[in-house]
């Protein structure tokens, strides 16, 4: 019989647990029995500068009301000294870290997703790169040593899609691609140390902001499907959270390192459902493309075709280069891993 709290005793950090996917992930990890640290910048009395009311305090309280254990800690993940201090606190209190989820967003008002690159307002360029990308690197940098010492752990990068991103804004698209690449690069370095790194994307996410945009609440979200059929295949933030919880429970998760998964794919494999008992599957949804401007669809097609040609050429070159590399002996690899882990 499966344990009611399979992650009991594990320590998890969800960076960006204020709202959206991050909040759902924190809730699902708490539901599975982990002690969850909910970090972010928005706390009571010090809300988001972008007008959002959610706080990490609320997220921690949701977990506690459901019978879980959660601690809200205000951390600005763009400030390395704050991040270093926070993980020092984790080390002192627990001496371990089992799961890190990087769900820090770049804040949509700054991202301006669909503007053409020659029209991009770069006023917030530095802030976007620091908040949406560098924060992830800073956080992983200071979390990893807690996993390396125990030769186990899971780092998850939350991304927006399971395909190559398209859209003109160079800030937005560079960040989206970089987060996928970050998981891949970390996986290569961490695998010899027993630590897994993956990227996971939700499907059509019913975040707080999306519900507001559709003019509905979680209790009546299906009403929005009358205008947008695609929304009927949407998922609550808890669904992607349960995907992360399933990975964290998997004793063979290291075999998955370096991969990109959709929440729906992991649901098929692990058998979990959304909070309402459904199993949404955005990957096989019959998408109604009439909801999107034809100019955008054509641009997306052109961009994707160019990207695939680029990747095909890059794959051939990389394979040719790899065929010329001498293979290191297993002893050499193990020695290097020990040296790296020891600093």
Regions found by a protein language model. Give the residues of each.
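Conserved glycine-rich cofactor-binding loop
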Residues: 11, 18-19
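Catalytic loop of short-chain dehydrogenase/reductase
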Residues: 106-110, 116-124, 128, 154-192, ...
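Conserved glycine-rich Rossmann-like NAD(P)H-binding loop of the short-chain dehydrogenase/reductase
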Residues: 34-58
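Rossmann-fold cofactor-recognition segment
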Residues: 61-79
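C-terminal helical subdomain
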Residues: 199, 218-311, 336
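A short, exposed helix-loop element centered on a Lys and neighboring polar residues
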Residues: 140-141, 184
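Active-site loop of short-chain dehydrogenase/reductase
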Residues: 10, 68-69, 96-97, 147-161, ...
């Amino acid at each position: 019989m499966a344990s009611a709290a399979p992650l009991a005793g594990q320590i998890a950090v969800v960076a960006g647990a204020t709202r959206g996917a991050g909040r759902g992930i924190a809730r699902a990890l708490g539901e599975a029995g982990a002690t969850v640290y909910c970090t972010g910048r928005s706390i009571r009395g010090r809300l988001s500068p972008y007008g959002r009311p959610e706080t990490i305090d609320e997220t921690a309280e949701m977990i506690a009301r459901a019978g879980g254990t959660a601690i809200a800690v205000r951390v600005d993940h763009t400030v390395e000294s704050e991040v270093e201090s926070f993980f020092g606190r984790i080390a002192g209190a627990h001496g371990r870290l089992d799961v890190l989820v990087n769900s820090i967003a770049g804040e949509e008002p700054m991202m301006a997703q669909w503007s053409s690159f020659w029209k991009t307002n770069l006023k917030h360029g530095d802030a976007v790169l620091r908040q949406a990308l560098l924060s992830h690197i800073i956080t992983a940098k200071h979390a990893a040593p807690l996993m390396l010492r125990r030769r186990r752990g899971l780092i998850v990068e939350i991304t927006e899609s399971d395909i190559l991103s398209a859209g003109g804004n160079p800030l937005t698209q560079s960040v989206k691609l970089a987060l996928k690449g970050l998981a891949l690069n970390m996986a290569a370095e961490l695998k010899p140390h027993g630590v897994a790194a993956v990227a996971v994307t939700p499907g059509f996410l019913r975040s707080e902001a999306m519900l507001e945009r559709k003019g509905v609440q979680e209790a009546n979200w299906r009403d929005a499907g009358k205008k947008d059929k695609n929304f009927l295949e949407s998922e609550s933030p808890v669904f992607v959270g349960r995907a992360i919880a399933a990975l964290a429970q998997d004793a063979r998760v290291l075999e998955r390192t370096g991969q990109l998964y959709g929440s729906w794919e992991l649901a098929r494999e692990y058998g979990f459902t959304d909070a309402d008992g459904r199993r949404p599957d955005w990957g096989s949804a019959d998408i109604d493309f009439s909801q999107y401007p034809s100019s955008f669809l054509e641009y997306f097609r052109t961009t994707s075709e160019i990207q695939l040609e680029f990747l095909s050429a890059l794959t051939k070159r990389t394979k040719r280069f790899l065929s010329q590399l001498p293979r290191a002996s297993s002893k050499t690899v193990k020695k290097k891993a020990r040296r790296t882990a020891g600093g």
